[in-house]
């Protein structure tokens, strides 16, 4: 057994497709998390109308958590358009991003098992 940061949810499957279409290997550690971090920064800046640190800080939780339209990998344009119209978004991303009340991200890991000499996803923790 072993573990690897990641998710097995809806967004993870979509991310694999989007990454593959863009020539990106999505199997590495923290690939989905890195994608989500960049997307959240972009969305927070759009929500606040400025591209600076304070704007990101003030808006990242509002674009990452409910309420709002769920946004998955490959839907950044949709999210940017919604925010430009004053609508709320709930960025799910590749890793089902959710922040606690104090701004910490809930993490998830995939438990792996070796069968027939290959790693197989067993479950998400």
Kindly give the residue locations of the regions a language model identified.
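Extracytosolic ligand-binding ectodomains
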Residues: 1-125
């Amino acid at each position: 057994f072993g573990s690897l940061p990641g998710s097995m949810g809806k967004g993870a499957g979509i991310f694999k497709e989007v990454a593959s279409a863009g020539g990106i290997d999505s199997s590495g550690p923290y690939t989905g998390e890195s994608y989500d971090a960049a997307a959240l920064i972009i969305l927070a800046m759009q929500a606040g109308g400025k591209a600076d640190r304070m704007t990101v800080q003030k808006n990242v939780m509002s674009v990452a958590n409910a309420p709002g339209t769920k946004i998955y990998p490959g839907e950044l344009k949709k999210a940017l358009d919604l925010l430009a119209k004053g609508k709320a978004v709930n960025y799910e991303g590749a890793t089902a991003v959710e922040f606690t009340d104090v701004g910490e991200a809930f993490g998830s890991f995939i438990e792996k098992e070796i069968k027939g000499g290959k790693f197989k996803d067993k479950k998400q923790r």
